[in-house]
Design a protein with these regions (language model features):
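N-terminal beta-strand motif that seeds the catalytic metal site of vicinal oxygen chelate
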Residues: 1-19, 46, 59-63, 112-114
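Vicinal oxygen chelate
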Residues: 6, 10, 31, 72, ...
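Secondary-structure boundary/capping signal
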Residues: 16, 29-30, 69
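Catalytic core of tubulin tyrosine ligase-like
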Residues: 22
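Conserved short beta-strand elements that form part of the metal-binding/catalytic scaffold
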Residues: 27-59, 105-110
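Residue-level hotspots at or immediately adjacent to binding/recognition sites across diverse folds
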Residues: 46-49, 58, 65-74
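Short beta->alpha connector loops
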Residues: 53-56, 67, 88-89
Length: 114
């Protein structure tokens, strides 16, 4: 499970428009999450989310790790940057954003135990 793509996030200014676009394109069904038009989707191979009011439109890939705190420390030891991991999101796990030693943005994901 270490290093496999585990989750993706689509950050956009308008989540409603993104849900319509990706829903039509890939035939995805979105489930409400949080407030507003934020949502999550379960594809045949990976879970993902759409959030809005993001100043930079982008897609982030999160890689699975068994221990997010240790993985974030390893990113830093290797010359990258890792935000402090977020608390557990029930049903989803823990997440953090990172940049590698050349500035490429990616995420780490520790899946929920339950």
């Amino acid at each position: 499970m270490r290093g496999e793509p585990a989750f993706f996030e689509i950050g956009v200014p308008d989540a409603k428009r993104a849900k319509t676009f990706y829903g039509e394109l890939f035939k995805w069904t979105f489930h409400p999450m949080g407030g507003g038009d934020q949502a999550w989707v379960e594809t045949p191979t990976i879970r993902g989310g759409i959030h809005d009011e993001d100043p930079e439109s982008r897609i982030d890939i999160f890689f699975a790790v068994p221990d997010i705190d240790a993985a974030a420390a390893a990113v830093r030891d290797l010359g990258g940057h890792a935000d402090d991991p977020r608390p557990e999101e029930p049903g989803f796990g823990r997440f953090t954003y990172c940049r590698d030693n050349q500035g490429v943005r990616f995420g780490l994901h520790q899946p929920s135990v339950a």
